[in-house]
């Protein structure tokens, strides 16, 4: 990208950006929630739309001069509705967390009971963690996975729901590698007359391309981020049934946000258009193929995969049998140029700052053009680095750099 002005006005900051650019260019990015946006997304994000205040919604603003940003937001909303066949869309949430907060506030009261997935079983902070606003403002209770299969225990979920009769059931996850049965959860919600909310932030790209069943026909509310598998700017969005549209919109503004970030909404519109194209479907199909191959190769090296494998874009790995913690594995792999994140596993015995596992995903490397053969090499690099962690691993780091050179991030930037 062109940094001519920044070079003159703030070379100190530009130096930091350049170092991060180099890190992204020469490292294998396996954090499941990260991706590389297109240059078009970045151009929209860096446009002069950032100058415009636009409190309110299209054609009902609290500021003048909004006729063109109204067009931008309308375009983003219509594209998002088309992408997921939804009745209503709100593209103003600054993040997935704020999208979740807005849904809770739209139909619930402080202190109401909500049933969500346990964080250590694959849920998310905003699904009831006691350190998060969700756990502080609402009475969250948790469901999790079966100890044997390590997949969602729907019988347990139903039992807890019948015993506690929550006002809402939240599904979706940040570290769950299997298909989620939204139809079954809808049936449980109907039995206790509860709202159904799905946080599909991680799997939105899979849902958009038919590689994961859509929650939209079943859920009252669906939230998502626009980065991760959707490959857009950092931000959030909400889909809902038309009957909840006013409540959701009011919860975002004036409920928890002021002016929307119009440059980000423009970038969201770009990514929704990209996700409607046929080549995006091919990309997501390759993501799933890559994840499955990477998982099988790691299993061949003796790594234990939570639930035994994956149906989506990510793998959760229990490192106990490798005699290394998630924290140490993250640091070790980072030293050779593979970026992962430490992650708790179901029935975790270690602190969330240490963890027994790591979470990895393939959306970012697939965006670069990596395919099955590269997945086999990544599995080899990971295994070799962990098995030979007391040795000099400079040759592995060099091999990783060479692979990255074959798949440059932004060839024409």
Curated annotation (Swiss-Prot):
Record: residues binding (6S)-5,6,7,8-tetrahydrofolate: 119, 123-125, 351-353
GO BP terms in the entry: glycine biosynthetic process from serine; tetrahydrofolate interconversion
Residues modified as N6-(pyridoxal phosphate)lysine: 228
GO cellular component: cytosol
UniProt cofactor(s): pyridoxal 5'-phosphate
Enzyme class: transferase
Entry keyword Cytoplasm: yes
Keywords: Amino-acid biosynthesis, Cytoplasm, One-carbon metabolism, Pyridoxal phosphate, Transferase
Subunit (UniProt): Homodimer.
Recorded family membership: Belongs to the SHMT family.
Protein's recorded name: Serine hydroxymethyltransferase
């Amino acid at each position: 990208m062109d940094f001519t002005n920044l070079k003159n006005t703030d070379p100190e900051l530009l130096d930091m950006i350049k170092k991060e650019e180099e890190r992204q260019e020469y490292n294998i990015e396996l954090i499941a929630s990260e991706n590389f946006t297109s240059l078009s997304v970045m151009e929209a994000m860096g446009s002069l739309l950032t100058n415009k205040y636009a409190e309110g919604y299209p054609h009902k603003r609290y500021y003048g001069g909004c006729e063109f940003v109204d067009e931008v937001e309308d375009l983003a909303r219509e594209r998002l509705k088309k992408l997921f066949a939804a009745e209503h869309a709100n593209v103003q949430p600054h993040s997935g967390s704020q999208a979740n907060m807005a849904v809770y506030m739209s139909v619930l009261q402080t202190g109401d009971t909500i049933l969500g997935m346990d964080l250590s079983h694959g849920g998310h902070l905003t699904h009831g963690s006691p350190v998060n606003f969700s756990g502080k403002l609402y009475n969250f209770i948790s469901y999790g996975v079966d100890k044997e299969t390590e997949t969602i225990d729907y019988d347990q979920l139903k039992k807890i729901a019948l015993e506690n009769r929550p006002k809402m059931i939240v599904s979706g996850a940040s570290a769950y590698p299997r298909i989620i049965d939204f139809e079954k959860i809808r049936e449980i919600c109907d039995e206790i007359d509860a709202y159904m909310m799905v946080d599909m932030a991680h799997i939105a790209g899979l849902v958009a391309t038919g590689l994961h069943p859509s929650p939209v026909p079943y859920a009252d509310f669906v939230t998502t981020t626009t980065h991760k598998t959707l490959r857009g700017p950092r931000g959030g969005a909400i889909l809902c049934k038309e009957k909840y549209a006013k409540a959701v919109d009011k919860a975002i503004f004036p409920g928890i946000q002021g002016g929307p970030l119009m440059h980000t909404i423009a970038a969201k519109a770009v990514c929704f258009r990209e996700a409607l194209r046929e080549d995006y479907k091919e990309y997501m199909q390759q993501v799933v193929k890559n994840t499955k191959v990477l998982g099988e190769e790691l299993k061949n090296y003796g790594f234990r995969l939570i639930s035994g494998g994956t149906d989506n874009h990510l793998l959760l790995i229990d490192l106990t049998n490798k005699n290394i913690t998630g924290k140490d594995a993250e640091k070790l792999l980072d030293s050779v140029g593979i970026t992962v994140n430490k992650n708790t596993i179901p029935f975790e015995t270690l602190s969330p700052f240490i963890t027994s596992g790591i979470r990895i995903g393939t959306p970012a490397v697939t965006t670069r053009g990596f395919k099955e053969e590269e997945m086999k090499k990544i599995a080899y690099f990971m295994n070799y680095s962990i098995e030979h962690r007391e040795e000099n691993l400079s040759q592995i780091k060099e091999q990783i750099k060479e692979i990255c050179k074959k798949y440059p991030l932004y060839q024409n930037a």
